[in-house]
Amino acid sequence: MSIIKKPDLSDPDLRAKLAKGMGHNYYGEPAWPNDILYMFPICILGALGLIAGLAILDPAMIGEPADPFATPLEILPEWYLYPTFQILRILPNKLLGIAGMAAIPLGLMLVPFIESVNKFQNPFRRPIAMTVFLFGTAAALWLGAGATFPIDKSLTLGLF
């Protein structure tokens, strides 16, 4: 006996269902509850056990060990935090920087209410939302690029 039950094509009922395009899943075991309750957890636990075993038996280092005596001149965050880092760096008052970062999501939440009279779903026919999106994208790219420059050239990107 094999693992997969082969269909009995001599059965007239099955042949009639197959002729109508039905019955392709008529034979065999159902996925619920057999596979979902029993086989899937076994596979998931086996994969997690394999990953844990490999991590214990052959741990790989993630980068170089830290050297407290070799600190860079300016410590930069990860690339996706550059715009917020730049906002906090250029504003003289830190509370003003935090309030500015909190105002960004609040302003974004107001856009649907401002443009509620516009019934179009096409973004090119919604000028306020499109303008806010393009301005926000340009500002985030500008601030992100400026975070890599020294503080005196960060707003102009060294261009002016």
Swiss-Prot record:
The protein's UniProt keywords, in alphabetical order, are: Electron transport, Membrane, Photosynthesis, Thylakoid, Transmembrane, Transmembrane helix, Transport
What molecular functions are annotated in GO for this chain?
Answer: electron transporter, transferring electrons within cytochrome b6/f complex of photosystem II activity; electron transporter, transferring electrons within the cyclic electron transport pathway of photosynthesis activity; oxidoreductase activity
Classification via CDD domains: cytochrome_b_C
What is the annotated localization of this protein? Cellular thylakoid membrane
Specify the superkingdom: Bacteria
Q: Which InterPro entries match?
A: Cyt_b/b6_C, Cyt_b/b6_C_sf, Cyt_b6/f_cplx_suIV, Cytochrome_b_C_euk/bac
Question: Transmembrane stretches, by residue range?
Answer: 36-56, 95-115, 127-147
Q: How does it sit in the membrane?
A: Multi-pass membrane protein
Report any Pfam family annotated for this entry.
Answer: Cytochrom_B_C
Report the principal subcellular site: membrane
Query: Which GO cellular component terms, listed alphabetically, does the Swiss-Prot or TrEMBL entry include?
Result: cytochrome b6f complex; plasma membrane-derived thylakoid membrane
Q: Would you kindly state one Gene Ontology biological process term found in this protein's UniProt entry?
A: photosynthetic electron transport chain
Oligomeric form and interacting partners:
The 4 large subunits of the cytochrome b6-f complex are cytochrome b6, subunit IV (17 kDa polypeptide, PetD), cytochrome f and the Rieske protein, while the 4 small subunits are PetG, PetL, PetM and PetN. The complex functions as a dimer.
The UniProt similarity line reads: Belongs to the cytochrome b family. PetD subfamily.
Query: Record's NCBIfam families?
Result: cytb6_f_IV (TIGR01156)
The free-text function statement in the UniProt record for this protein reads: Component of the cytochrome b6-f complex, which mediates electron transfer between photosystem II (PSII) and photosystem I (PSI), cyclic electron flow around PSI, and state transitions.
> What is the protein name for this chain?
Cytochrome b6-f complex subunit 4
Q: Which organism is it from?
A: Synechocystis sp. (strain ATCC 27184 / PCC 6803 / Kazusa)
